[in-house]
A protein has these predicted regions:
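N-terminal positive-inside, membrane-proximal cytosolic segments immediately preceding the first
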Residues: 1-6
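Hydrophobic membrane-insertion alpha-helices, especially the h-region
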Residues: 8-22
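N-terminal export/assembly leader peptides and their processing motifs that target proteins to secretory
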Residues: 22-143
């Protein structure tokens, strides 16, 4: 009887330890997601210039590469439900929207030279439903 009680208590203790480890991992993952999101959310409320936008585009491309996000035939990242990031740039002077890949692949240095002092504002921010990570930012040129 005593032996069975010890086995049951031991199993109960192991189960509690497993649940605690799972909760700790879940909390750490949530903290990491919040940290990653804050890197992009800080641009939501303020105006930035072209050089800052170029830096943000480079960061998004690096993140997509790190996460092994595949590209389509045009070289644009294919959005997934977990960790892809897209940045679109809406140019109001010519009424056209450019995906970040087009700017990045067509010489981002040239973009910086041409738009370094132009002001932009984040007009839309979207999140992945599955993970809560940022999925898309849309920046609009200010006049």
């Amino acid at each position: 009887m005593k032996h069975q009680l010890l086995i049951i208590l031991g199993l109960f203790f192991i189960l509690i330890c497993i649940v605690c480890v799972m909760l700790i991992n879940l909390r750490a993952e949530k903290i990491e997601i919040n940290k990653e999101n804050m890197e992009y959310e800080k641009y939501q409320t303020k105006e930035i210039i072209g050089t800052d936008l170029a830096t943000l585009i480079s960061k998004a491309v690096d993140t997509n590469e790190k996460n092994n996000i595949p590209k389509n035939e045009k070289g644009y990242y294919i959005e997934n439900d977990e960790n892809s990031i897209k940045i679109d740039l809406k140019m109001t002077t010519i009424d056209k929207t450019y995906p970040m890949e087009e700017i990045y692949n067509n010489n981002i240095t040239m973009f910086v030279q041409n738009f370094n002092t132009i002001r932009f504002k984040c007009t839309n921010l979207e999140y992945h439903k599955k993970t809560g990570k940022i999925s898309k930012l849309i920046f609009e040129e200010l006049q």
